[in-house]
Amino acid sequence: MSEYLILCSILFSLGAFGVLYRRNILVMFMCIELMLNSVNLLMVYFSALHNDQSGQVFVFFIMAVAAAEITIGLAILVMIFRHLGSINIDSLKKLKW
């Protein structure tokens, strides 16, 4: 049991570190997905541990919503890159009114 908890906490920590310390928006999206997938892995593990399938079904819905989120996020990212020529988070200050 502790191996899954350790793995998920390491993955979540790596994702949180990437979101906090990286300036590239694409890398930040990947780190957010890493955090989300670590929580999904933990939810699947606890669902299997308690012989309950509802947690595993819930993970499928989370993955579908995450796919839609990434699709919209990447579309916005492409438009930002076309407009500014950079996907650095600091370049978004140019979009202020």
Swiss-Prot record:
Q: Name one GO molecular function term.
A: quinone binding
Which GO cellular component does the record give, naming just one?
NADH dehydrogenase complex
Q: Where in the cell is it found?
A: Cell inner membrane
Q: Which GO terms describe its biological process?
A: ATP synthesis coupled electron transport
Catalytic activities = a quinone + NADH + 5 H(+)(in) = a quinol + NAD(+) + 4 H(+)(out)
Q: What EC number(s) does this enzyme carry?
A: 7.1.1.-
List S-S links within the chain: none
What is the annotated role of this protein in its UniProt record?
NDH-1 shuttles electrons from NADH, via FMN and iron-sulfur (Fe-S) centers, to quinones in the respiratory chain. The immediate electron acceptor for the enzyme in this species is believed to be a menaquinone. Couples the redox reaction to proton translocation (for every two electrons transferred, four hydrogen ions are translocated across the cytoplasmic membrane), and thus conserves the redox energy in a proton gradient.
Q: By what name is this protein known?
A: NADH-quinone oxidoreductase subunit K
Organism placement in taxonomy? Bacteria, Pseudomonadati, Bacteroidota, Cytophagia, Cytophagales
| Primary gene name | nuoK
